[in-house]
């Protein structure tokens, strides 16, 4: 089955690479229209997935990721239209010039070819990834979580109908609808057909891909994100940022999971934090330095377990740790962070600069929420993933991250001397 999918994707990629920006946008507009026109089919499939997931004991955080509503589906269709408005990087001349030999040389952006994406129970990813791949002239093979099997099948069927109505092969966007995990291992060895693999999931999936894949892999999406509250932070303003970073949508990878509090501000900061977290329904997992003081406040508090510093809660839970200074905070982030998104709240710009320079994450913030790490927020449109590695892309992966380049030499029957 996968062999045939690979062949179809590779053939489709050749046709996609020849499309103009206008032609690609026409396809995307058709997909957006069809997602809305056939929304009832997709929503019914999603309702079945959600019901099964709830019956199987899936957490509320995961159910939130899985669930579609009419408003969310309309938002997904609107996101596709936003991709139409983005500049197409394919064909862009990055640099070039005329050599001494007279050869005119250009370095030009081109599609990667076929992208493979393995992802969790988030049905919006199916459309986001497909739209970005199509915009950049890439075919894509999708392997979503088993919890979204019906939703993904219905969504991809709509996309393929739109492709065919525009004269393009259905092989441009395909989904593996068999939940058998053995197919993941088979997919990891499809280097004959897949040019880049993006796993979006937990540490176990990333480890499997790094160890078994014969395809170049870009990992990311695990977000153990930190906020360090420096001793000079403005408490009221800091709390607004923390509430946003923790509660706006707890199930996302850019949500803060650990709060590091400078010991010199703890006495005034922790009572205010407890009040705010109680109002927001957040459970605090406190270290010994913060536990006693937080227990006198209104927020629910438990003693933090050492392993929780490495957890991506994806829920209304927040670690709180007292640190001695900036060095202590940076050391903690280096030990427990996932190089996703980390922030400092401070009025001391020297400390801010040190934090920016010394915290080796894909996104580092000064006096801002970690929730900004998102393709849409960065002006990149929808994203394929948030890469936490350094090659070939880092941070939110928009259109440019789905391209490579080729060197093009144009001569007049020019020969090398």
Swiss-Prot record:
One of its GO terms (molecular function) is NADP binding. SUPFAM superfamilies: ALDH-like. GO terms for cellular component: cytoplasm. InterPro entries: Ald_DH/histidinol_DH, Ald_DH_C, Ald_DH_N, Aldehyde_DH_dom, G-glutamylP_reductase_CS, Glu-5-SA_DH, GPR_dom. It catalyses: L-glutamate 5-semialdehyde + phosphate + NADP(+) = L-glutamyl 5-phosphate + NADPH + H(+). It is found in: Cytoplasm. Keywords: Amino-acid biosynthesis, Cytoplasm, NADP, Oxidoreductase, Proline biosynthesis. The keyword DNA-binding does not apply. It holds the Pfam family Aldedh. Gene3D superfamilies: Aldehyde Dehydrogenase, Chain A, domain 1, Aldehyde Dehydrogenase, Chain A, domain 2. It is an enzyme of class 1 (oxidoreductase). Its EC number is 1.2.1.41. Catalyzes the NADPH-dependent reduction of L-glutamate 5-phosphate into L-glutamate 5-semialdehyde and phosphate. The product spontaneously undergoes cyclization to form 1-pyrroline-5-carboxylate. HAMAP family: ProA. NCBIfam families: PRK00197.1, proA. This is Gamma-glutamyl phosphate reductase. It comes from Escherichia coli O17:K52:H18 (strain UMN026 / ExPEC). The lineage of its organism: Bacteria, Pseudomonadati, Pseudomonadota, Gammaproteobacteria, Enterobacterales.
